[in-house]
Amino acid sequence: MLRWAVGVLALGITSVCWGQGPAKLPAKWEELTAEEFRQAIGKAQGTCLLPIGILEKHGPHLPLGTDLLNVRYVTEHAVTQEYAVIFPDYYFGQIAEARHEAGTVAYSAEMQMKLLQATTDEMGRNGCRKVLIVNGHGGNENFLPYFAQSQLDAPHDYVVYVQWGHDATKKAGAEKEGPDWHAGETETSNMLVTHPNLTHMDRAKNESGADQKRVRLPENVYTGIWWYARFPNHYSGDGSTATKEQGEEDLQAWINTVVRAIRAVKADEESWKLQKEFYEKSGKPMETAH
């Protein structure tokens, strides 16, 4: 009787397993087996995401990896609507302006370019014909477009796209006391959704995030020390006013933006054709006809 019962139980378990069907294909590069990776690249139509964050101070109340934590939350939710392969954690961006703060990891400009180029080259070698860099860090907004532009220096068999920003949702009058640019209401609201256990609301008032306005130059004149001149505490805004509801609204807008970007990149066939044409012509500029 015992053997019969065990046999029936085993058969039942097997039937349940069969009924579950094939396992869902992960989107994260590091979670795929080698065979699954081949399937994932096919399913993604060769489209891979490279979410980029940074390690830097985020006021007195948010973790150093806030940018990476938030951008990965967004991309991981976006690919449930439009599948793409997500590259593992990447925080090797531009953050020279925060080198004076504990915990900041600031690589040289040369290292940033070399490492990102090597990374996208390896992604391309592994079948990523379209690499969509999803930026989660404001300090990368000049670096990443320049990197994309630099892809015209030499031929590549993949195309780099850069996505940054979204239609941020802010409460009326949110910036009446000054800019809300770093670890303030918006970013803190996002963290209350993505990682509430790492968000220390009781510390948000421990430092000032006010604009110090220590250098006054025309808007069309740039100097590298501008951020430190305005926000020496590496804090811009007031995180104490953050709410989870605001974070949910803002993150959904961000997710929607990334979904649209993935779909647009998948549909784009012209960039590769034109890039290939450009490489061929740039090798023989004297033969370019007009």
Where is each model-derived feature located?
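Extended, histidine- and acidic-residue-enriched regions that form the cofactor-binding/catalytic faces
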Residues: 20-110, 114-132, 138-290
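N-terminal secretory signal peptides that target proteins for export/translocation
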Residues: 1-2
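Bacterial N-terminal signal peptides
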Residues: 5-16
